[in-house]
Structure formats: C-alpha cells, structure tokens
Curated annotation (Swiss-Prot):
NCBIfam families: isocit_lyase
Positions occupied by motif Microbody targeting signal: 551-553
Pathway entry: Carbohydrate metabolism; glyoxylate cycle; (S)-malate from isocitrate: step 1/2
Transferase found in the keyword field: no
Record's subunit section: Homotetramer.
Originating organism: Candida glabrata (strain ATCC 2001 / BCRC 20586 / JCM 3761 / NBRC 0622 / NRRL Y-65 / CBS 138)
Main location per the UniProt record: other
Record field: transmembrane: none
UniProt protein name: Isocitrate lyase
Length: 553
C-alpha cells in the first residue's frame, strides 16, 4: 500500500533535519579542540538524541572553552595552572584575583556541603547532587560579582576614573569539579554529568574506583573497576556533553597506584596485577573467615587469623609465581627463561592470564598452580596489587577519552611523578597531566623548604599542567578560625581590629567593605532603576556605617 504524500514528506523532513544536525555535529568535531578525542559513536547517533528544542549554549560550555584555552596555553608555554578547593563564594571571589581555575572538592563537600546536611568522610555516600549544587552555588556567585564589577566600571566617566579602579578582575574563573566514581552505573554517570553541565562546571574528574566501595584517594581499602568499565564511564560523560552541545573538559583519574582490590577480572589488561594463591591446599579465604566469625571470633583475633591465612596462601602475582618456580627448578638457564617470560608478560603488555599460563608451561614444561579466586575477600572482590606502572597502563587506556589524566598517589614523590609522566607520554607525547598537591601528604616531612618552593614548577616541566590542593579551602578556613578564636578569647576586640580588620586595610582586601562586596550598591541600583531613579529604602544611602571606610579602600 503506497504511503500518503503527507506522511512521506514528514519522513523526508525528519531525515533531512537529522542529516543536517549530524553534519553540524561532524563540523564541530572536526575542530582542533577534538584532535586527541576518541568517540565510539557517530554524529548521527548524537543528533537523534538531542530532541527538537533548539540547542542551548550552556554557561558550562562557555566556561569549558575558556578552561581549555587556559590549559592549552599552559601546555604550550610549559607553565602550570595551580588552584585549590574552594569552600564558598568568599573564597572564590578572592581566588579570582590570583588564580586561573577553581577546584571543587568532593571531600570538602562531603564534610561541609552535603545536600542531606549530614557530614561525613569522603566516601561519596552523599546525595549525587551535592557537588553539582556546590558548583552552582559558586558559579552564581561568580556571575554576581562579575555583574557587580561590570556595572561599577561602566559608570566611570573617564579613562582616568577607570584607571583609578585598577585592573578588572576576571571573576568568571572556570570551575573543575569532583565527580567521584559516578555515583552508580552508566545512567547515573549520564545524569551526574548533565547536572554538572547545567550548573556551570567547566570540567569534571572521575576516578576508576567502584562507586559502591569508593574511598578518599588517601584512604586504605581502595577498589578499582576493570579498565574497560571506566572507559565506558568516560565515553558516557563525553556522550552526555555531546548531546548537550558542551565542550566539558574531562579529567580521568586512576586510583590504581595504591589499590588493593578490583571488582572483576574480566579485562585482560588487569590480569598482570591480580593477586593469586600459590598454595593448592588452602581453603577459600571467604569460607575460612565466615567459619571463624560463625565460631564467635572477632576483632584482633580475626585480624590474626587473616594474617595467618595470607601467610599460608603464598599470595603472589603470576609473574612472581613463575619466577619462583623457575628458581626452584633444575634448569640451568634460569635468568634467561625468566627474561623470556617477562619480555612477553609485563605491566604494559596487556597479556591475558590464559596467555601467560600457556607461555609459562612452554618455558617451564609444567603448569603452575595460581588461583585468584581463593583469596577473594568476603565482599567478593579480587585482590589487586597496583603501583605506578599499573597507573601508567590505565592512564594510557583512558587518555583517548579524556583531556587530562591523573594518578592519585600516597606521597609527593617527584621521581614517581616522573615515571608516570614518562610512561604516559611514551605513548601519548602531548597528553596533559594533572597532579593532586594533597594536604594528606606531610609536606614538611616529605621535602625541604627549597624543594617545596619549586615542586609545582618541576612537575610542570614534566607536563603536569593542572595542579591543585584539594582541601586548601578547608584547611585555611580551619587555621584562620582557630587562630582568631584563640586570639579573640584572649585579647577581645584588639584581636579583630588588629589581626583582621587592619590587615584587610593593609592588603586591600575588598571584603573589608562587606556591604559593597555583597552587592548592596548593585542591588540599590536595581531598586532605583525599577522606581524611576529614587529609592527611600536604598541600603547604601546616608547613614550606612560603611562610610567609615571611605579612606581605606
């Protein structure tokens, strides 16, 4: 039966619209911005998922373009964008004077800004809108201070008056935020990304931990997911951004350097790092522990039983088990055989366990007992031994799907940072790197004062173009309030007048005039504009106490 013309025309119009949208997306993807980006889907597949509403230019996309240019400039010049975790609009407004990016930390949000109002450690167990809401909080403050400054400068009646105000501050400093481990499966990752884009984030980072067992990057018990599973997360982030026509910057973080667990052994790239038992006479760890718990064992005694099981199990990586078997054998060319094996089975060879076992048997003439199921912990997770080379392997796998890669580490070890950078750049020479200048490190113990002074620049020479102190907002606030509370309790108003207000005057801190900083003059202007130029209730009229500071700032 022939299709009526009206229906045929509708179909043709629909296909023409999709074809046009797909062509526009392809043109967008052909821009230099995407030279290093790998996508696993077509422009048409994105076009059919955008809907009929005209594409929006989200503020996030504007800020993403800005931060990309900032980072690109640092990459070309061999310099560094340095920043730290901002807690609130006060900190953001002051950071804008000196820094070119802003960081929003999930750790800080977990302890100070959960949308459940329930504080806690950095386990990403707060509601998934917590960090996006903090981004929105800070982004709206940035916009407000930008509007306030713009109006003030627009009122200048001469170049001299404008010069007297000093250089304009770029309050619209791009925000890169913590997306933790995605707060669930791929649909959660998609929705979380959408929230960040809608709320003004220029970029987000996501780590390769499990979302159910997520820990702070400086806690024990970290469990990573298979390589491909995290790649799927990164693809989902980019897919969401593409659908929303956002150029969101993606930072791929790996926690594998100190990971001790992995959720699955499905990905062959992880096989080299999975720990197995080499004692065939050992019972499964989970059964062993369950039996002890059922018998009433707990606490320290349970820990002792676990240690005893581990010692008896002979836990090793497969290449270690192979080397031990070779060294125990009667073959004469032991080192040659071990080298032949290691040349084909290494941290970056992505050799499967099946292939490694086959090679081991060819070289040694027998099978080696190695079972990674026996040591599985009671939560069902496999034991894993990461390290720097593991992080290199994962960062290389993630690099095509992210703009920056980051290895979370336990110490500010420059040589380790060099090993990671060189390992990644051996495959991707222009790859951008990020580094966490963590306050979890004991910096005075880790290096000398002179080394502290040059650490950022030295990392920058290795390619770490974005570096950040995750919790500096938290720590500086705690220190300032601790010190002021102590002084105020002892010295009364002298503590505030001399140690706060006078220093604000000396340093030219704009919050000294907190009414003006808060936008009272700007809002007065709106009221007057709405009321024909006059407002009897203007906040900054005659009688405002801030007139006392006219000569100070």
């Amino acid at each position: 039966m022939p299709v009526p013309n009206s229906e045929a025309n509708e179909f043709q119009a629909l296909q023409a619209r999709i074809d046009a949208d797909a062509k526009e997306i392809e043109q967008w993807w052909s821009e230099p911005r995407w030279n290093k980006t790998k996508r696993t889907y077509s422009a048409r597949e994105i076009a059919i998922r955008r809907g009929t509403f005209p594409p929006l230019t989200y503020p996030s996309s504007v800020m993403a373009k800005k931060v990309y240019k900032v980072l690109e400039k640092h990459h070309k010049e061999g310099t560094v964008s340095r920043t730290f975790g901002a807690l609130d609009p006060v900190q953001v407004s002051q950071m804008a004077k000196f820094l070119d990016t802003i960081y929003v930390s999930g750790w800080q949000c977990s302890s100070t800004a959960s949308t459940s109002n329930e504080p806690g450690p950095d386990l990403a167990d707060y509601p998934m809108d917590t960090v996006p809401n903090k981004v929105e909080h800070l982004f709206k403050a940035q916009q407000f201070h930008d509007r306030k400054q713009w109006e003030n400068r627009a009122k200048a009646t001469s170049q001299e008056e404008l010069d007297a105000m000093g250089p304009a501050i770029d309050y619209m400093t791009p925000i890169i935020a913590d997306a933790d481990a995605g707060h669930g499966g791929l649909t959660a990752v998609f929705k979380l990304t959408k929230m960040f884009i809608e709320r003004g984030a220029a970029g987000i980072h996501m780590e390769d931990q499990t979302s159910t067992n997520k820990k702070c990057g400086h806690m024990a018990g970290r469990c990573v997911i298979p390589v491909q599973e995290h790649i799927n997360r990164l693809v989902t982030i980019r897919m969401c951004a593409d659908i929303m026509h956002s150029e969101l910057v993606i930072v791929a973080r790996t926690d594998s350097e100190a990971a001790t667990l992995i959720s699955s052994t499905i990905d062959t790239r992880d096989h080299y790092f999975v720990v197995g038992a080499t004692n065939p006479d050992i019972e499964p760890f989970a059964e062993y522990m369950d039996r002890a718990i059922m018998a009433g064992v707990s606490g320290d005694e349970l820990q002792k039983l676990e240690a005893a099981w581990i010692e008896k199990a002979g836990l090793k990586l497969f290449h270690e088990a192979f080397a031990d078997e070779v060294n125990k054998s009667s073959v004469s060319n032991k080192q040659e055989i071990i080298k032949k094996f290691n040349d084909k089975v290494g941290p970056l060879t992505e050799t499967s366990h099946r292939e490694a076992k086959k090679l081991a048997k060819e070289l040694l003439g027998k099978d080696i007992f190695f079972d990674w199921d026996l040591p599985r912990v009671r939560e069902g997770l496999y034991r894993y031994r990461g390290g720097t080379q593991c992080s290199v392997m994962r960062a290389r796998a993630f690099a095509p799907y992210a703009d920056l890669v980051w290895m979370e580490s336990n110490y500010p070890d420059f040589e380790q940072a060099r090993e990671f950078a060189e390992g990644v750049k051996a495959k991707y020479p222009d790859q951008w790197l990020a580094y966490n200048l963590s306050p979890s490190f004991n910096w005075p113990k880790a290096m000398s004062v002179d080394e502290q002074a040059t650490f950022i620049e030295r990392l920058g020479q290795l390619g770490y173009i974005w570096q950040f102190i995750t919790l500096a907002g938290l720590h500086t606030t705690a220190l300032a309030i601790h010190k002021f509370s102590e002084d105020f309790a002892r010295e009364g108003m002298k503590a505030y007048a001399q140690n706060v207000q006078q220093i604000e005057m000396d340093e030219g801190v704009d919050v000294l005039k907190h009414q003006k900083w808060s936008g009272a003059e700007y809002i007065d202007g709106l009221l007057k504009l709405a009321q024909g130029g006059v407002s009897a209730t203007a906040a900054m009229g005659q009688g405002v106490t801030e007139d006392q500071f006219k000569s100070n700032l």
